[in-house]
Amino acid sequence: MKLLLILILIINNYNLCLSYECNSNRTYGLKGSSCEINADCLFPEVCFNSVCSKIRTTGESCTKKTDCTLTYDFGDCVNGKCEIIIATGDRCNPKVTSQKCSSSSECKNGICQLISACNSYNCPLNQYCDDKTKQCKPIPNDINSIVCKANSQCPTSHICTSSNKCIIKYSSKVGEKCTDSPLQCRVFNGEICNQETQKCIKNDQYFKQCEDESTCNGGLCVCLDDVNSKSVCVGPNGELNNEKCVNLEQKLEQCLINEKCNTLSPITCKCFKQFECFQYECNSVERFYNYKSNYYQSLNCSRFLTKP
């Protein structure tokens, strides 16, 4: 479930292009333009010293933490230089001064390893924190043998139910219960969990015009484009109605496992471009937010979206 937490965190941290931000007069600054915040600049430029500039990378000068990070990159400004903060389980190099392991961990044998008790958030991907030993342990391959208390005790492709079992995400059809999580429903099929009946339903408001989320039946109201100032209803976390997104998410999860990524950082994770392409294909905020459209077109996403 760590991947899901990362995705939701990214969505929530974005300055979402919601209906009340839909502005036909909105423009974005090119490199060298004046700015106040990152969203004033055409991606991937960021606002540094009130000027749209390239993102500060490790070892470059900075004045504050946000100079060294995009939403999903764990960076910090230390003594006027950008450092990358590496998650537990990710590869590290103690000789590189511009990188450091996250708190409660240190670089041992080329891997950031915990040196104190674990919690629900600091174990590596597909490991969980054992309540008794307070040590990270691998999630068992036999899903049926798992007795879970939280999503973090299940594989990234599963969620934990109230009956303490791991079930696969998006497995409940229309009319079936979604009492444990909205992600039991097939959100990439335009379906949603009805909060009153706790059953999956087809969202009849999907992609219909909206003023705010009160008319979206539990989904988000997002700006379709800044040109026409039109907003539409989408999934509860911005999901688009695209059946292939489940498969694309599974490919991304497998990439994270293969590459041993524990954070979706553009600096430390080789799956980052694949993640961006997944977001563009499957999330409305990424798809329709004009300040990123040119950047996404340059990524050549077809190599990820058609990869078996």
UniProtKB/Swiss-Prot annotation:
Classification via PROSITE patterns: C_TYPE_LECTIN_1
Chief location bin: secreted
Keyword Glycoprotein: yes
Superkingdom of this protein's organism: Eukaryota
Compartment(s) where it occurs, according to its Swiss-Prot or TrEMBL record: Secreted
Glycosylation sites: N25, N300
Span of the signal peptide: 1-19
One Gene Ontology term, aspect cellular component: extracellular region
Keywords: Glycoprotein, Secreted, Signal
Keyword Protease: no
Protein name: Uncharacterized protein DDB_G0272512
Organism: Dictyostelium discoideum (Social amoeba)
Lineage summary: Eukaryota, Amoebozoa, Evosea, Eumycetozoa, Dictyostelia
